[in-house]
C-alpha cells in the first residue's frame, strides 16, 4: 500500500516514542494498527464493489445488445410475414389455362391426346381373394 522501507519505519517509531512516550506507545500502536487494518479492509471492499459494478455494467451492455438483436430479428420476421400475407391477399387465385378456354368458349374442351386421357382414367381396384 505505502512504499515505506524498514529504516523509515524505525525513524517513525523513534519519533513516536519521543513524542508520545513509552507508557502510551503500545496503546497508540494497537489503535493505529486497528484503524490501518480497517482502512485496508474498507479499500479492498471498495475495490471488490467497483469490480462487481464494472462486471455488472458489462453484463448489462451485453444484455442490452442481445435485446436489440432479438428485437431487430423479430421485427424483420414480422415484416416478412406481413409481406407474405399482403402478397397472398392481393394475388387472385390462378385459373388453369384449359378451364379458362372452356369458360371462354362456353363448352367442354376435348383432350388433345386421347391416349393420355385414356391412361389417366382410374383402373378398377383389385379385390382380395376371399
Curated annotation (Swiss-Prot):
Ranges of Basic and acidic residues composition bias in the record: 80-89, 96-111
Q: Where is this region: Disordered?
A: 70-130
Give this protein's Gene Ontology molecular function annotations. Answer: protein transmembrane transporter activity
Signal peptide region: none
Annotated transmembrane regions: 1-21
Q: Which GO terms describe its biological process?
A: protein transport by the Tat complex
Q: Which Gene3D superfamilies match?
A: 1.20.5.3310
Instruction: Give the subcellular location.
Output: Cell inner membrane
Name of this chain's protein = Sec-independent protein translocase protein TatB
Q: How does it assemble?
A: The Tat system comprises two distinct complexes: a TatABC complex, containing multiple copies of TatA, TatB and TatC subunits, and a separate TatA complex, containing only TatA subunits. Substrates initially bind to the TatABC complex, which probably triggers association of the separate TatA complex to form the active translocon.
The job of this chain, per UniProt, is described as: Part of the twin-arginine translocation (Tat) system that transports large folded proteins containing a characteristic twin-arginine motif in their signal peptide across membranes. Together with TatC, TatB is part of a receptor directly interacting with Tat signal peptides. TatB may form an oligomeric binding site that transiently accommodates folded Tat precursor proteins before their translocation.
GO cellular component terms attached to this protein's record:
TAT protein transport complex
Chief place where the protein resides: membrane
Mind listing the UniProt keywords for this protein, alphabetically?
Cell inner membrane, Cell membrane, Membrane, Protein transport, Translocation, Transmembrane, Transmembrane helix, Transport
Q: To which protein family does this belong?
A: Belongs to the TatB family.
**Topologically, how does it sit relative to the membrane?**
Single-pass membrane protein
| Family matches, as Pfam families | TatA_B_E
Amino acid at each position: 500500500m505505502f512504499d515505506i522501507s524498514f529504516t523509515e519505519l524505525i525513524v517513525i517509531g523513534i519519533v513516536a516514542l519521543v513524542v508520545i512516550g513509552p507508557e502510551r506507545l503500545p496503546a497508540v500502536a494497537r489503535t493505529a494498527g486497528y484503524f490501518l487494518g480497517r482502512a485496508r479492509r474498507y479499500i479492498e471492499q471498495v475495490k471488490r464493489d467497483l469490480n462487481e459494478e464494472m462486471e455488472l455494467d458489462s453484463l448489462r451492455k451485453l444484455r442490452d445488445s442481445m435485446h436489440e438483436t432479438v428485437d431487430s430479428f423479430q421485427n424483420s420476421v414480422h415484416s416478412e410475414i406481413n409481406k407474405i400475407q399482403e402478397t397472398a391477399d392481393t394475388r387472385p387465385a390462378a385459373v388453369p389455362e384449359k378451364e379458362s378456354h372452356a369458360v371462354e368458349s362456353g363448352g367442354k374442351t376435348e383432350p388433345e391426346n386421347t391416349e393420355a386421357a385414356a391412361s389417366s382414367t382410374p383402373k378398377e381396384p383389385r379385390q382380395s381373394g376371399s
